[in-house]
């Protein structure tokens, strides 16, 4: 699965993208976020609060309940806030 990171997510993880293998039990965007949160302190800081993130699967905005597969490209980016 190809993961792409934008803005503060990219800064926190120190990389713009990566390709990973995920367990067969990871079937949703939310499941992927939970899996990633367990991959180390930087990942935990980014993925432990899904309310602070948005995602896209194959360049289409996705909800955390939406399905993912190992052939997908999943992008994570911070929520947009305004002032």
Where in the sequence are the language-model features?
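Ubiquitin-like/PB1-type beta-grasp interaction modules and other compact soluble beta-rich domains
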Residues: 1-82
């Amino acid at each position: 699965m190809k993961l792409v990171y934008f803005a503060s997510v990219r800064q926190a993880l120190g990389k713009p993208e990566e390709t990973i293998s995920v367990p067969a039990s990871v079937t949703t965007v939310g499941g992927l976020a939970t899996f990633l949160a367990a991959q180390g302190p930087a990942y935990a800081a980014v993925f432990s609060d899904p309310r602070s993130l948005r995602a896209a699967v194959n360049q289409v905005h996705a909800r955390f309940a939406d399905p993912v597969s190992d052939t997908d490209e999943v992008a994570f980016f911070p929520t947009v806030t305004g002032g």
